[in-house]
Amino acid sequence: MDTFITRNFQTTIIQKAKNTMAEFSEDPELQPAMLFNICVHLEVCYVISDMNFLDEEGKTYTALEGQGKEQNLRPQYEVIEGMPRNIAWMVQRSLAQEHGIETPRYLADLFDYKTKRFIEVGITKGLADDYFWKKKEKLGNSMELMIFSYNQDYSLSNEHSLDEEGKGRVLSRLTELQAELSLKNLWQVLIGEEDIEKGIDFKLGQTISKLRDISVPAGFSNFEGMRSYIDNIDPKGAIERNLARMSPLVSVTPKKLKWEDLRPIGPHIYSHELPEVPYNAFLLMSDELGLANMTEGKSKKPKTLAKECLEKYSTLRDQTDPILIMKSEKANENFLWKLWRDCVNTISNEETSNELQKTNYAKWATGDGLTYQKIMKEVAIDDETMYQEEPKIPNKCRVAAWVQTEMNLLSTLTSKRALDLPEIGPDVAPVEHVGSERRKYFVNEINYCKASTVMMKYVLFHTSLLNESNASMGKYKVIPITNRVVNEKGESFDILYGLAVKGQSHLRGDTDVVTVVTFEFSSTDPRVDSGKWPKYTVFRIGSLFVSGREKSVYLYCRVNGTNKIQMKWGMEARRCLLQSMQQMEAIVDQESSIQGYDMTKACFKGDRVNSPKTFSIGTQEGKLVKGSFGKALRVIFTKCLMHYVFGNAQLEGFSAESRRLLLLIQALKDRKGPWVFDLEGMYSGIEECISNNPWVIQSAYWFNEWLGFEKEGSKVLESIDEIMDE
């Protein structure tokens, strides 16, 4: 943590933070988390002060607006935080006396010369609103409050006290610090600022003690008697006693479960009367087309990267006469095409900014002005035209072949790798050597898997999107969808998959939605599988020669939306690696414990004694298909990625409900003779979650296939048992 603080904060800020701790007899070496919190708090105060200025007439200027007028400007905010305590009190009293206002009881962080108000600044790991009211209760109206959270929300007592750019700067800095801390596994060590406030110990007086004794529930004479009862109470058996009282009201007949009682789940997924489940992932996956540009491997700004790729493929960039191939139900194809041309022009120009003009078609695409208006409950009751919206129940869909195709393509090996993993230090102990060897085998298999390229695209895009959403709340921004890959020869390529447009993003809550319009390149003709693309408007924008063959290039356009929770999950998509690797490592560990030596190499490649391990990874023409250990690893990794990409409430519910059914099947396989009641109720709970989520529907399809194989296997075992009995 000490190294992290030194690298991320200016020396003057660190020194002031240490001086502050010294005043309270705190040791920075013993309390590095406290030192970090004070440094962050100080830096935020300086960011706010450095961004806002006043002229001699009292007119406000941002740092950008004040360029060239520095001689006539002075800071709008006086920074009190960081001064020695006695000097800080003297400054606070002087400012209050000078401006004819009351001196607050508590020491403030800033003073606003424009509003003549003292300001308290707070940083929290929790919800900004919660911490705001905690501070408000303590400080009352003696000063203004500015609360910022690492969760990317904020709460201000005066909304006009800080402009959007100032809020964006603070929130972007907090995002950056959180990402750095998480990368170095220091985030969990950190405590919130609200956790380090000192309490005051005091003895209860006679009056308060009497009030406490009077306030105990009926049945207790005083507080100490109630405390003694709670300390000695035995909670065991309480649930059983309550259930026993309810038994006359409950009528349950347990039934021993047999294989014949189990049926396939979600029979509607086979109905041809229902539409095929449409593609609804945020970005294209196996259908993506990347415009590649060889590079030296140096880091670039996303706009520069996108500009260079578009310059190389100028025929696609300069296309002005597209052919409309497919149109979504609510789309305006003319507006979408105009917006695409604006995006290309913004990326291609010489300016450093990637801001879009707020044209009428940009406003249409981003839904500007279409948000719900909040009104008071009292107004709604009096207004007869106000009514509760009917809940939107998702339409049922049937299984589609494209989900299995996506799965197959994403789990294949390619000639390029995009996976960006941190380097690890040299091995010290023998167990570390085993871990390094195992990591090498696992990463080599995953590195060139198509799914890892898609995963990194999601990580990079959501990181850029969250940063732009925080830094430019009221602006429309063009965000390139990019990646960087390395081929087998070690050559680096910048890849441009398309462009996205971010609408206004005043995201105060985690579930507040920001509109994102995506424009992605593809060589897939949407008419081949039209049921897959009802959410997209598709243009043909030209062709490319690949390996001597001409391929049409299509532009897939979609108006979409996301929120901070989904963006943060997108940034953390690398976690898909952990799930798959841990699952396969458990198998290696089990084999190693049986054989008595490390079986990593044997599982992947085999050795003199053992042949390489194989697993059932799918079906073909009604028969199980076997695959290598590496293939199984890639399949599980791809499933983890799909679980993230298509994750929603349906998938959460399906995973939780179907787990019970899986446990019953496992008990039948182990011949434990499970008993059940209300089996149909459990099926109903599972099928309620099978609506229009592609991954849920495909999982139900695979489950039914697997159940069929298990039933066949059980019949074989039963016939063997009968022969043995005879």
Swiss-Prot record:
Phosphorylated on serines and threonines by host kinases, including human casein kinase II. Plays an essential role in viral RNA transcription and replication by forming the heterotrimeric polymerase complex together with PB1 and PB2 subunits. The complex transcribes viral mRNAs by using a unique mechanism called cap-snatching. It consists in the hijacking and cleavage of host capped pre-mRNAs. These short capped RNAs are then used as primers for viral mRNAs. The PB2 subunit is responsible for the binding of the 5' cap of cellular pre-mRNAs which are subsequently cleaved after 10-13 nucleotides by the PA subunit that carries the endonuclease activity. InterPro entries: INFV_PA, PA/PA-X, PA/PA-X_sf. GO terms for cellular component: host cell cytoplasm; host cell nucleus. A motif (Nuclear localization signal 2 (NLS2)) lies at residues 183-244. Influenza RNA polymerase is composed of three subunits: PB1, PB2 and PA. Interacts (via C-terminus) with PB1 (via N-terminus). It is an enzyme of class 3 (hydrolase). One of its GO terms (biological process) is symbiont-mediated suppression of host mRNA transcription via inhibition of RNA polymerase II activity. Mn(2+) 1 binds at residues 41, 109, 120-121. This is Polymerase acidic protein.
